[in-house]
């Protein structure tokens, strides 16, 4: 796919339609949740059918929404007191215009491949912007929107709120409630800190001397990884849930059931020893658990770590894997989040012990896995005035074992799972992916 870049510019916030002066520079201190999350760029791809909205309309909407979401027009830096912060300096978001002399249906892959990276701005070198966008127009009139944002500034929940507001601003509609930012008094340890969980070995780890095993993208593993798209129909999911929940008063959730099935499927395809242990890392949103508003803009996520032996996963029924996931997620409740705050902010651990965040990127997760579930995020509500996107998916991210769960664009309750696997495990994965056994 040959992509021709036409222009690149910074889009700055437009206050009150561009007639009001910009406010003074402000600083949003990074919260402890921002500091322990992944230091990575989160990249997603949208596709809109013709007639696609004009670039001028999209840019105008972007300038308007950045006035409300200033963090996405700022930069990562330091506050005057030397603390890590998002600097609200209105530098702007990078907007790239590009074109492809071909029809989208002939060029766009149905699953993430290296070619998808051409639908994003170049991410090489030191990035100055928090948000980078590329609008790529195809010969047929379709539009691809490549969106990239710094994960340290906002998690998936916050980013999806921004995207919906961007669409509304482009259509001239109210953007909704403004974002609520972190401040020094928002997350604090309790007067009498009470650490109830082993945060040293969950959110943190103690690096060994000279430990460089937590790198990403420098080991050549990506050449042997393919991202497989598994489509689970509503009927298939219903069958899985019925099988997993048999004899249980309250059925397992759609997420618990699909993840349990994929955990077992990946484990079987990998051909692991029965005595080997497998752990899943999955995000748990803390907004409700800590009583934070839904509009909180930043990171407010910790992780659950379901763990089981390969033998148990493969010889015991689906119900077992679903129960392990359910119990571990339930454990990460409000008390768990408060225990983490006490540990991380009271001086009980963290930097003083030489600990580092365990949320680090790897090329290969085997025998473990990680899941990003976007099943409840309103990504499909991004509408620039010509309707919802025809599809939405994560961009190319070749980390073996990193799963993404996304609602299908069909809108019928089906789910798409994007599963990076080794080439030599792909056929084994396909063989058991749609089996109820």
Swiss-Prot record:
Give the enzyme's EC designation. Answer: 2.3.1.-
Keyword Transferase attributed: yes
**Is NADP found in the keyword set?**
no
Q: Which residues form the active site?
A: 151, 383
Name of the protein in its database record: Putrescine hydroxycinnamoyltransferase 3
Q: Which UniProt keywords apply?
A: Acyltransferase, Transferase
Family per record: Belongs to the plant acyltransferase family.
What job does the chain carry out? Answer: Hydroxycinnamoyl transferase that catalyzes the transfer of an acyl from p-coumaryol-CoA to putrescine, to produce coumaroyl putrescine. Can use feruloyl-CoA and caffeoyl-CoA as acyl donors.
Tissues expressing this chain = Highly expressed in roots. Expressed at low levels in shoots and flowers.
Q: Which InterPro entries match?
A: CAT-like_dom_sf, Plant_Fungal_Acyltransferase
- Recall the GO molecular function terms of this protein's record: acyltransferase activity, transferring groups other than amino-acyl groups; hydroxycinnamoyltransferase activity
């Amino acid at each position: 796919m040959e992509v021709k870049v036409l222009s690149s510019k910074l889009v700055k916030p437009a206050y009150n339609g561009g007639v009001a002066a910009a406010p003074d520079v402000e600083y949003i201190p990074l919260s402890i949740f921002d500091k322990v999350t992944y230091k990575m760029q989160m990249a997603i791809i949208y596709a809109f059918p013709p007639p696609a909205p004009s670039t001028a309309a999209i840019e105008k909407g972007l300038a308007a929404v950045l006035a409300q979401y200033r963090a996405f027009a700022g930069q990562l830096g330091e506050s005057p007191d030397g603390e890590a912060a998002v600097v609200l300096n209105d530098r702007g978001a990078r907007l790239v215009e590009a074109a492809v002399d071909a029809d989208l249906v002939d060029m766009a892959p149905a699953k993430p491949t290296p070619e998808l990276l051409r639908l994003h701005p170049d991410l090489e070198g030191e990035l100055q912007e928090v948000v980078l966008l590329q609008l790529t127009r195809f010969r047929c009139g379709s539009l691809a929107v490549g969106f990239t944002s710094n994960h340290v500034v906002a998690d998936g929940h916050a980013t999806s709120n921004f995207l919906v507001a961007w669409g509304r601003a482009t259509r001239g509609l109210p953007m909704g409630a403004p974002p609520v930012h972190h401040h020094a008094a928002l997350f604090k340890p309790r007067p009498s800190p009470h650490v109830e969980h082993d945060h040293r070995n969950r959110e943190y780890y103690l690096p060994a001397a000279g430990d460089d095993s937590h790198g990403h993208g420098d080991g050549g593993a990506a050449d042997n990884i393919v991202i497989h798209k598994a489509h689970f129909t509503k009927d298939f999911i219903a069958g899985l849930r019925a099988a997993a929940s048999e004899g249980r008063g309250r059925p397992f959730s759609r997420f618990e059931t699909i993840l349990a099935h994929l955990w077992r499927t990946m484990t079987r395809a990998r051909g692991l020893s029965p005595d080997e242990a497998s752990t899943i890392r999955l995000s748990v949103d803390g907004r409700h658990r800590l009583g934070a508003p839904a509009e909180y803009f930043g990171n407010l996520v910790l992780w659950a770590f379901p763990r089981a032996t390969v033998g148990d996963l493969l010889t015991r029924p689906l119900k077992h894997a679903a129960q392990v996931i359910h119990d571990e997620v339930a454990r990460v409740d409000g008390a768990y989040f408060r225990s983490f705050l006490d540990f991380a902010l009271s001086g009980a651990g963290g930097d003083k012990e030489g600990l580092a965040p365990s949320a680090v990127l790897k090329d290969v997760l085997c025998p473990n896995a990680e899941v990003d579930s976007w099943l409840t995020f309103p990504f499909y509500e991004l509408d620039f005035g010509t309707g919802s996107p025809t599809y939405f998916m994560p961009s190319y991210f070749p980390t073996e074992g990193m799963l993404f769960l996304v609602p299908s664009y069909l809108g019928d309750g089906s789910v798409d799972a994007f599963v990076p696997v080794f080439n030599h495990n792909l056929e084994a994965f396909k063989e058991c992916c749609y089996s109820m056994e």
